[in-house]
């Protein structure tokens, strides 16, 4: 049997076999769950899914030729870098979920702005009036925190609403689709501009807890805050207290602080579900009938670059994620 050069740390399914067969036809590979460590001595790369489920029993430090890990998911928070040799480079699937997360972000923005849950409750009760207090995306200003692949996809979808786009990235360098761009160290200045504030940033040592009480207080009292990035960029208690004390402020969240994917449980430290100015979804922005195929193709395309001797895209700096 051909020695494996690629280790696939994902639940076995036909879609994976199909994509790998098309994009890496000459590369030997096997699943972690079905493979034999005795055939892993030539493994150079890993396709990584869930850290909690798929890395159980894998001793990455015992793989002498492992040099690259491509994650299926966008985020790299939670990856146990200490279990890998220092030589190993990591890449997230940046842009892999962008079309789907961006669509969900706009849906959340509209649900919160138009008070759709309250409107549904009125209709279900057979009432027409008084209607919920509705806000518009049309010709308003949206601030997008994290103007990467997801941020740009959100901006593109807001174009139809004639929304003015203000961005925030690391450097403040101008980018297409933005009328104004702020550097990351001007977070408070950026959020002051927004009728809508979208957070699409990764969770890194720099972004963790960056939206605190002072940043929330800098937002407009009637702003709508949408988070489709990582919950950890926001201080949980600060958001709860701000929503409680500012009834005209609204939030729409797809990401949460206490997500247990292994058990399928979502816990809350504060009673967010009781807040009338919050709309939430269960970290489901990346689900849909065409998502898996698109995501796999993007991730494997980057692996193909690696195996062809080219520089993979979206390689991260481990120091931005590793805990001191």
Describe every region a protein language model picked out.
Residues 1-48:
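N-terminal glycine-/charge-rich "phosphate-binding" loop or analogous flexible N-terminal tail
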Residues 166:
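Conserved beta-strand positions in the Rossmann-like core of class I SAM-dependent methyltransferases
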Residues 222, 229-324:
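Rossmann-like dinucleotide-binding domain for NAD(H)/NADP(H)
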Residues 44-123, 131:
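Phosphate/diphosphate ligand-binding glycine-rich loop within oxidoreductases
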């Amino acid at each position: 049997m051909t020695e494996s050069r690629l280790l696939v740390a994902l639940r076995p399914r036909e879609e994976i076999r199909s994509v790998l067969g098309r994009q890496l036809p000459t590369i030997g590979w096997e699943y972690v769950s079905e493979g034999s460590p005795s055939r892993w001595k030539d493994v150079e790369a890993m396709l990584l899914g869930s850290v909690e489920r798929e890395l159980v029993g894998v001793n990455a430090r015992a793989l002498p030729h492992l040099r690259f890990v491509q994650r299926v998911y966008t985020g790299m928070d939670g990856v146990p870098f200490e279990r890998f040799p220092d030589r190993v480079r990591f890449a997230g699937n940046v842009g892999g979920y962008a079309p789907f997360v961006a669509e969900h972000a706009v849906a959340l923005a509209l649900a919160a702005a138009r008070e759709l849950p309250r409107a549904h409750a009125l209709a279900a009760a057979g009432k027409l009036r008084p209607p919920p207090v509705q806000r518009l995306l049309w010709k308003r200003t949206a601030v997008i925190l994290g103007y990467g692949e997801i941020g740009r996809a959100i901006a593109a979808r807001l174009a139809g609403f004639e929304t003015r786009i203000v961005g925030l990235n690391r450097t403040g360098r101008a980018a297409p689709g933005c009328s104004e761009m702020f550097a990351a160290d001007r977070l408070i200045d950026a959020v002051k501009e927004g009728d809508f504030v979208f957070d699409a940033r990764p969770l890194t040592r720099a972004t963790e807890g960056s939206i605190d009480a002072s940043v929330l207080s800098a937002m407009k009292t009637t702003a709508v805050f949408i988070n489709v990035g990582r919950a950890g960029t926001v201080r949980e208690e600060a958001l709860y207290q701000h929503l409680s004390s500012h009834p005209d402020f609204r939030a729409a969240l797809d990401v949460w602080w206490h997500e247990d994917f292994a058990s399928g449980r979502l816990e809350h430290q504060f009673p967010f579900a009781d807040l009338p100015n919050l709309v939430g979804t269960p970290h489901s922005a990346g689900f849909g009938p065409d998502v898996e195929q698109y995501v796999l193709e993007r991730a494997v395309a980057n692996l193909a670059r690696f195996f062809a001797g080219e520089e993979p895209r979206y390689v991260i700096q481990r120091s931005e994620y590793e805990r001191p």
